[in-house]
Amino acid sequence: MISMLSENEAKILFFLKDLKKTNSVELAIKMGIPESSVLSLIELLREKGYVKTEVKSEKHYVLTEEGRKRKESGLPEDILINTLNGQEKDLNEIKNILNKDFNIAISWAKRKGLIDIKEGKVIPKVKTYMSSEYLALSNLERADSNTINLLKKRGLIEEKERKIVSVELIKEPKESEIGISNLNRELIISGEWKKYKLKKYNVEAFPPYYTISKKHYFREFLEKVKDIMISLGFKEINTGYIEMEFYNFDLLFQPQDHPAREIHDSFSVEGSGKIEDKDLLNNVKEIHEKFWKYEWKQDITLRLMLRSQTTATTARVLASRPKAPQKVFTLGKVFRPDAIDATHLIEFHQLDGVIIDNNFTFKELLGVLKEIFYRLGIKEVKFKPAYFPFTEPSVEAYGYLEKLGWVEMCGAGLLRPEILSSVGIDSTAGAWGIGIERLAMSFLNISDIRLLYSNNIEYIRDTKVKIE
């Protein structure tokens, strides 16, 4: 039975017809394919009786990591001469330019007679220079033995052994033994196709799987949430991760001895901030001392921290004394010390929103929240009374999810008059904060919060976001 030749096998035999004998390295270059592929093809041809092979070991030189670096940047002595450009310079000036290459450059330049050093100055003997070692780094095959020895001495190349398979043609193929996989118009019209064997196709084989780029599912979820807020007429705002305790706590009517300020509940950052608005600072101080009955300290309020709630961004909005009506939101990371497990992370996302409007009511706030959750795909929502330091009245919102039942979604309420009066806002304001990771876990059917940040490529490809 005649064994059909593949197109690449036929190509190798075609090259050998002229060369008679060659090796795997040359064939790989001629065919433009990896040597490993050529070796596999040669072995198939040997088994079919078309070629004979012989394996030889050959020593050759390759660039070390330092050699690759010098090939890109140049050798230190070359850089030194080109830096001098025919002019003498102070040793210290050269040292500052060459840094860690200074000693190597001076040593080799003196050894090669390229410079003199007198009275703390480097005096070049040539204006330009390019060493033979540098030129050899780009073409080791043509380098002479002296240059090779220098490169080895300098640790720029290393000797390695490789196996080369020499190939010799012993039988030429017949046209009927050559298979083709692409039947084109020319072959059909000319009738040439009759001389070849057509490669068999497995019609039951699955087509190749092509992966297309897509957003990370959690990033896609975050963007969908932003789109919903913008579609409801809210404007997005963002502030930095590092915040003063003033905006994270004090302006939100949270006393300076509150447990949330303890080291186990927030991350401290070295240094302190500055608040230009002294009237605002004094207003907050007076309100704290009047209602909380303690001595408010400015050095505490100016301390820096990683924000523990995006309500700090809401606080900055309030501090800018915006005029009603205003509808803004922020979606960003917050940071809290915690033991990382399936339900806790030390950094996570919060969605905070605030509406400032004349005569804005608590009932309207609940309506806005229901609409947000409805657009997120949560059709059933209920509210329970709650307590938060900066809102009154306050509620917790719960949404019904098929697999989990009633799940807490957010905390919300009307901002306390103590907060609004400190920033000089006469209108009513409603605010809320939503834990985004909890929502995302529900929508993506994820039981481990760490999977929201997975870098497992297969898992990322297979996970989809769908919000009805």
Swiss-Prot record:
Matching Pfam families: tRNA-synt_2d
Natural source organism: Saccharolobus solfataricus (strain ATCC 35092 / DSM 1617 / JCM 11322 / P2)
Transmembrane segments: none
Entry's family note: Belongs to the class-II aminoacyl-tRNA synthetase family. Phe-tRNA synthetase alpha subunit type 2 subfamily.
Record keywords, A-Z: Aminoacyl-tRNA synthetase, ATP-binding, Cytoplasm, Ligase, Magnesium, Metal-binding, Nucleotide-binding, Protein biosynthesis
Cofactor: Mg(2+)
Principal location class: cytoplasm
Example of a GO cellular component annotation carried by this entry: cytoplasm
Location(s), subcellular: Cytoplasm
Protein's name in the database: Phenylalanine--tRNA ligase alpha subunit
